[in-house]
């Protein structure tokens, strides 16, 4: 699991509303006239971490944050296990979902999107289609993912991509792998639209270390959180 529990620095603010339709989302109202943001979670969906993260972005200056639930049509996980999450995830048709997501983003006037893991893969596709100007992907999959309706493999189009996007990964991400990390580094060096940040000593899902007793790991997680927040909110 990338993350489950919300760290103490995330507010325990309840959502202020919800949206139901082709795209379902929880709404978190901010106190400012800042940008409208959208959060794409990992395969476990809208758990406590992502609800807290959406509330955190609203508190930090977003006008409103929409936490999208890609798996709303399939119901909650009966058991929160990796196997159950993957079984549900494979029911999602990635390409069709992202097409609906793009229409939703346009209709909701979203100005920034952040995605984690699977959601990070979706962010690459949003960058390819030049959907919004503020894009952040945490530990995404530039090598692509298998699916019954797969998206194009990011490695195939990243060299020519012109839409700037921020990618934040750990140098010890076993799901990304060393070869894929090196390939991503090479593409980022050749294309300044790829704003790549590599967190030293961090693995997949490193924001789970925000409250780690290991001060070095916690510092890396806080730096990664800060990079993404600054990109989304400006500054």
UniProtKB/Swiss-Prot annotation:
Pathway given in the UniProt record: Aromatic compound metabolism; 3-chlorocatechol degradation
InterPro entries hit by this protein: AB_hydrolase_fold, Dienelactn_hydro, Dienelactone_hydrolase-like
GO biological process: catabolic process
E.C. code: 3.1.1.45
This protein's UniProt keywords: Aromatic hydrocarbons catabolism, Hydrolase, Plasmid, Serine esterase
Catalytic activity: 2-(5-oxo-2,5-dihydrofuran-2-ylidene)acetate + H2O = 4-oxohex-2-enedioate + H(+)
Pfam family, one: DLH
MF terms in GO: carboxymethylenebutenolidase activity
Enzyme active site: 117, 173, 204
UniProt similarity note: Belongs to the dienelactone hydrolase family.
Biological function: Ring cleavage of cyclic ester dienelactone to produce maleylacetate.
Miscellaneous note of the record: Carboxymethylenebutenolidase is specific for dienelactone and has no activity toward enol-lactones.
Quaternary data: Monomer.
Protein name: Carboxymethylenebutenolidase 2
